[in-house]
Amino acid sequence: MFRLLATNKTAIGLDPRPSPATHVVDDLSDRVWLRDLITREKITHIIHAGGVSGPMVMADDPVGVIAINVTGSMNLLNEAMAGGVTTFVYCSSVAAIGNFYEQEPIGEDYPMWPTSTYGCSKAAVDYVLRGLWKKMPLDICSLRLTAVYGPGRTTEFTVDTIVRAALAGKPARLDPLTDWPYIYVDDAADAAIAACFSQNRKQLAYFVAHPERVTPEDIAAACRAAGYPVRLEIDTSKPIAARGPVDVEAAARDFGFRAKIGHREGIRRMIEAATR
């Protein structure tokens, strides 16, 4: 939100939880209320980044995940169409793809085989957007974010697990995974803003990632370089979570986005923020 305001755009933050960036507290369940908000505030562009934020959240409540991520998204999309919004950017996830590992970067047309309810919820909305793309006046775009990390994240994923263990002087316990692509939170925000106001997008979906492919050992090395060594304990009895390279050139070509913050700098910033 703060990066959007820095572009001199008038912005309204909507979230179910109050925060300094939240102007409206809402959960996207009331379509009539959403339509009134869009009309009253003369909303022209929507960046929809809300909802259940990862497979680790509400993993035991699939009905709740679908209600928030699918029904809530459909409510917002429907009222955007009815309210004359011009652009709708949906923050999807590489989790919509599921496990994959190709030697060459995959593109937007790679098959979606999600492996979690969260991933299924993201794929479901992506399919709806595919069905609507170029068939209505609303300009729609789906950004398939890879693993987002950085200061301020309240849920825990691989980077968070390793960094928090390093800060606590404890081992980091992980399930096995490949060398994943990641995206720092500030880069993810910049990508959403760039896509939202671009006039040159040529496709519906784009992957948003730093081109680095990062292993848990790389993350641990970055913690060590920042002064916080950590030992990894990998549970090899679990299946490997595979993610390979994704196409980042389409985003660069169509809306000028290239991730700037690699994992070493991103982890340094996380540790700095946590130790202030």
Across the structure, where does each feature detected by a protein language model lie?
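Substrate-binding strand-loop-helix patch
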Residues: P151-E156, L177-A189, A205-C223, I261, ...
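Glycine-rich NAD(P)-binding loop of the Rossmann-fold in SDR/ketoreductase-type enzymes
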Residues: S29, H45, G64-G72, M112, ...
